[in-house]
Structure formats: C-alpha cells, structure tokens
Amino acid sequence: MLDLAYLQTAPEQTALLKQQATDFIVREELGYPLSGDGEFAAVKIRKTNANTIWAGEQLAKFCGISVRNMSYAGLKDRNAITDQWFSLHMPGKPTPDFSRFRIEGIEILEVTRHNRKIRTGSLQGNHFDILLRNADATEELNRRLNLVKRLGFPNYFTEQRFGRDGHNLTEAMRWAKGEIQVKDRKKRSFYLSAARGEVFNLVVSDRLQMGLATQVMPNDILQLAGSHSWFQANEKEDLNALQVRLEHHDILLTAPLIGDPPQSANALENQVVAQHQALLTLMKREHLKPARRPLLMRAQNLNWQFEPTGLRLQFFLPAGSYATALIRELVRVVD
C-alpha cells in the first residue's frame, strides 16, 4: 500500500486509528429481508475485538452443528465493534434459546429463521462510524474531506485482502509459479482474491500516476452506476458524451479483477496486466472468470465533525470497498 498512488498527494497529517474498539464501529446492511422461516437460523450479533470466523465457530458450537454449516456475508474487522448476520443450517431442528448464549465479546442482537444460506458477498454494504484520534481541523484536511466527498477515493484493496504481512499474496505468487500446491478450499479462495487484488491495485495506481483517474480513455470498460453492467468505450462511443456522464456519476471507470479469458481494455491497463502472466495462467487453471470493479468509490452519506479527541467520520460503503482506503486519502495512520 505504501507505494500506491493517491488521488491527491500523500496526506500531511497523521492520526491514530483503532486505539479502542469504539473508534471503529461497523453495521452490516444485508439489503434484503429475512424470510422468518426455513432451514437456517439467522443470528445477528455485535462482536467486540473478535474476528468473524471465531465468532461464527462459537455460534455453530452453541447450535451443535459443524462449522461447515455456518456462514456469513463478509469478514469484519477484529479491532472494532461490528454488527453482522450469520446463518446456521439446522434443517428440522428448532432454533436454540440464544438468551443462554454467553461468550465474552459476542452479544446476540436478533434471531430469526431464513430459507437461504447467507452467502459471502450477499450484502448491500456497511455503515461506518470511525474516530481518527489526534486529527486536527487543518485547512489541508478539510480540503481533502471535501474532495473525497465530491470525487471519491481510490477503491484499493487494503491490507485485509492480502493477509498479515501480505502472506496471502506471497502464497498466491508461489502457487502461480508452481512452487506450492494449495488443496485447502478456503486458502485457494484467499490466495486468488489476493492475486486479483494486487493487479487491480497496480492498474488503479498506474492510472492515478498518469493523472487519468477522472478521464474516459478509448477502450475503457465502464460500469453503469448502481448496477453490475459494463460496456466498452469503443470507436462507436462518443468519448465527450461519456465524459459528461462520468462527471454526473451516471457511469464509473473500472479496473480489472483478472480472470480467463483476459479482457482487453485501454492500452494502459493492458500493459500492466500483461506483466503478470503467471497470475493470468493461474486464473485460467482455476477457471476464474474476469470481472470489473470501480476505479474510484464515493462514500454515501459522508459526514464528519471534529471533536476534542479527533475527527469523527460517518459514511456508507457498498460491499467490497474498504473504509481504510478512504482514510488513506485523508491522513497517514501511525501506530
């Protein structure tokens, strides 16, 4: 992350993040109603300084089912207070009495039934309430806040995607080069995600360095706002008209989540992607289809206020975007 470009320049001001669990609060928004009946117990919890997988294991143990029958929509930060849903596959079994559930760091908020598994990625997004300690109301920081509100921030994958000390990315590279075999299904998923995240970040950073993060280029692959539909800015498209649509947030620039067959986009992107042949071969071997991801992301309902202890941010991000990528554009987080 240190070498990736900024939409603006590197921030001047420093701040402290996650000094206390209350400094980083996340509320998950599934975006769909739960059915109230079905084979799955659906449990909404509030966890404090606990990781998602461990919390899910405790729920599965309480229900007397295998951890394989537990699922969730997304991994949440450990050093935080986070609200999220879990589904527990219990066909033909009654919902346990969760008022008897007693595990430090986990509070049961809501219990119901659902007719489907809550799958990874099956959420609308997350609400954030974050305190950046020691951040002062300088002219520079206010300017950054207003620019992030207007233009957005580079939609980078951050450290969570790559594992501790980049372990998942390191292993993905070794796997791609044939140095290791990976049989564990979860590890395969983590490593493939890290590999795609790395190439995406490099494409975005390269484009930012060229000053083209808000400019439609020939052969760009563009996303219709609010959808997962893409189209290409080929010779049939009017680039000036597309530029106007981009500025009105009707369409979004995208960067690749590599897969097979490879996508041909603008020349700048193609050049970066071509430097990662081993990863492209891995994607082909694993039958991973290509996808796109917005190059910039605008936080919804972004609000802020300066408090005696620092800067408080409140905003909503769609699933898959990282609050730490937004914060990176505002301040340098120090230990």
UniProtKB/Swiss-Prot annotation:
It is an enzyme of class 5 (isomerase). CDD domains: PseudoU_synth_EcTruD (cd02575). Signal peptide: none annotated. Its EC number is 5.4.99.27. It comes from the Bacteria. HAMAP family: TruD. This is tRNA pseudouridine synthase D. The lineage of its organism: Bacteria, Pseudomonadati, Pseudomonadota, Gammaproteobacteria, Pasteurellales. The gene is truD.
